[in-house]
From Swiss-Prot:
The keyword Chaperone applies. Belongs to the TorD/DmsD family. TorD subfamily. The keyword Chaperone applies. GO terms for cellular component: cytoplasm. The lineage of its organism: Bacteria, Pseudomonadati, Pseudomonadota, Gammaproteobacteria, Vibrionales. GO terms for biological process: protein complex oligomerization; protein folding. This is Chaperone protein TorD. Keywords: Chaperone, Cytoplasm.
Amino acid sequence: MMQEIKAFNEKRAEIYWWLSSLFAKELTQEELDKYQSMEIRAFLTGLAENDALRPSVNAFVDALNRLVDRQDAQLELAADFCDLFLKTAKHGALPYASIYLTKDGLLNGEPAQKMDAWLKKHGVQVNQQLNEPADHLAIMLDFLGNLIIRSNELEQDRHMEEAFIEQNAFIQEMLLSWLPSFSQRAAEYDEFGFYNSAIKLLVAFCMLDSDYLVG
């Protein structure tokens, strides 16, 4: 039983790390090519076997299929990334919790401090290349992947239960508290729909994962 849980933990962490990579930086041509590979397509088909994930996975696959016919796809997708995530909160969907959870909607608010506390508590070093406030979505998802993998060092059922409670608290308080609002913003400004579909998939996966953790 414990081995099954740990094997599933590895899959969960991989999904969060994969999603983190989508929001960390623009995709290179090489990375984009991988999305058309059999390996990635099989991974996405596997995710779509879950009823809760199927609609958002299908939308993401649809965006991938449309990318094949999109002229200068890599450059255009990089422009989408820039317009959505790097410009202004007024005309995009900035990937920081503080934008959505504080009254003034400014960067480096209380959510960034809370995230700093999570990082310090668990001694996790974030990707220094990101050079972003701690409540940047890519950092938060990378951290969650680490939190999950670290729980695989545990051997007793009650310790794993405690780890699940903590992981669920992180998902509910640090992610699902603002991701739906972030998703709405992305839907408004992402005309092509690649990143919008990725965010919808992330929200669906967080909700599914939370259900798994409390189940």
